[in-house]
């Protein structure tokens, strides 16, 4: 039984989901705006927002934990150097999900995921 198990499987194995959200998180932090399906966008929020909260307190332990989740030195550097200080005064809600219609081909609902207060 899967009672009280949070998270959506999205038709993928656990390792595939982990790799997909790792890649999506890196893309989001690099470009600050990505387009994806609505269910993936909602699930990405559960992965990316705790990383930004972690980046608000710069420590070696937090950097190592973020690297274990993202596996990209460049994105960890941007996370702790740019994004953490940017959201220092904001108590959560770092991402905005905007619906943007349906995909041609399979009619999947699409959404933009963007970091709030981006320039």
Swiss-Prot record:
A molecular function (GO) term: structural constituent of ribosome
Keywords attached to this entry: Ribonucleoprotein, Ribosomal protein
Recorded superkingdom: Bacteria
Stretches that traverse the bilayer: none
GO process terms (BP): translation
GO cellular component: cytosolic large ribosomal subunit
PROSITE patterns assigned to the protein according to its UniProt record, in alphabetical order: RIBOSOMAL_L17
Database matches in SUPFAM superfamilies: Prokaryotic ribosomal protein L17
Assembly with partners or alone: Part of the 50S ribosomal subunit. Contacts protein L32.
Family designation: Belongs to the bacterial ribosomal protein bL17 family.
Protein name, as recorded: Large ribosomal subunit protein bL17
Organism of provenance: Psychrobacter arcticus (strain DSM 17307 / VKM B-2377 / 273-4)
